[in-house]
Amino acid sequence: MKSIKLDIKKKNSLRLTKQEKKNVIQDFEKYGILKFSDITQSHKLLFNFINQFSLSYANDANRRPERFDNSRIRNVDAGNQEIFLHSETSFSPSQPEIVWFYCVNPGSDGSGKTVYCDGLELWRKLSPKYKMFFLENPIEYKLRVPINKKISGNKKKKWFLEYPGVRNCFLNYRKNSLEFNFIKFAVEKSRIAKKLSFANHLLIPLESEPQILGRGFLNKKKINKEDYNYITALAYEITEEITWKKNDLIMIDNLRFMHGRRKINKKNKSRDIVTIQTMISNFGFGSTTSLK
């Protein structure tokens, strides 16, 4: 993770020059995760800053309350439980390119640290045995996605969702949801040419994500428990922590990094982190990385 301290003269607007924006993009594509220390107390300026890198935003889960009268700024998941490593919404077509976290309050005791794992490094460390398995066998997720507005009807209706990997798509009127299977590989193309990243939703327990009804491999292949535990242990071996300070902003390449959270102590009731999800960035994918 690279730390960036913005010029204090920019604090009243956070408007970057073309060169300053280019420098941020170059660092982002190289490191994949950036920290902007003590960026601002203004939630409006915060969103304006993020908007300089965003073409569109992802529709975050309804379970996360809206913050600061901005539907794009949401709470992180509630509760004190540990959240295991994952790439945000990597189980569906709604996977954002960039995930942002902003610290409103780091909390009273420092518990609940955000953690991150570089999928490029994890993929590099996996043996050919595992690489061959994941390159040959895509994951199939069985999903039920809530629909924000009430839909009327009694039966399921066949539905068309125009995205590669979607099949068996139905509107479920009784559940007020969209149900479908989604086929996705565990590895992603990265912003660095010819480099792959292991970034997915394989390492979390299913009960932690209500939208996932089932998860397996398309051709019924399975990973045995020993191999699964090895990959999980390897991921956490290279996992690092973020020590939050008030007004810090983190920018994460969601197609490269997996993130999670340590358990929050029950007495730590003041921890307050919010998230914004850039669905599509407004700069070219891999636009600053050299072809090597």
Locate the predicted segments by residue.
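Active-site environment of non-heme Fe oxygenases that use a 2-His-1-carboxylate facial triad
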Residues: 1-16, 21-23, 68-72, 79-85, ...
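TRNA-binding/sensing appendages of the translation machinery
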Residues: 25-37
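Short secondary-structure capping/junction motifs at helix and strand boundaries
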Residues: 33-34, 57-61, 108-113
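Glycine-rich nucleotide phosphate-binding loop and flanking beta-alpha elements
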Residues: 42, 91, 258
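Glycine-rich loop at the start of a catalytic domain that most often binds anionic cofactors/ligands
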Residues: 43-56
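Cytochrome P450 catalytic domain signature, combining two hallmark sequence patches
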Residues: 54-62, 131-133
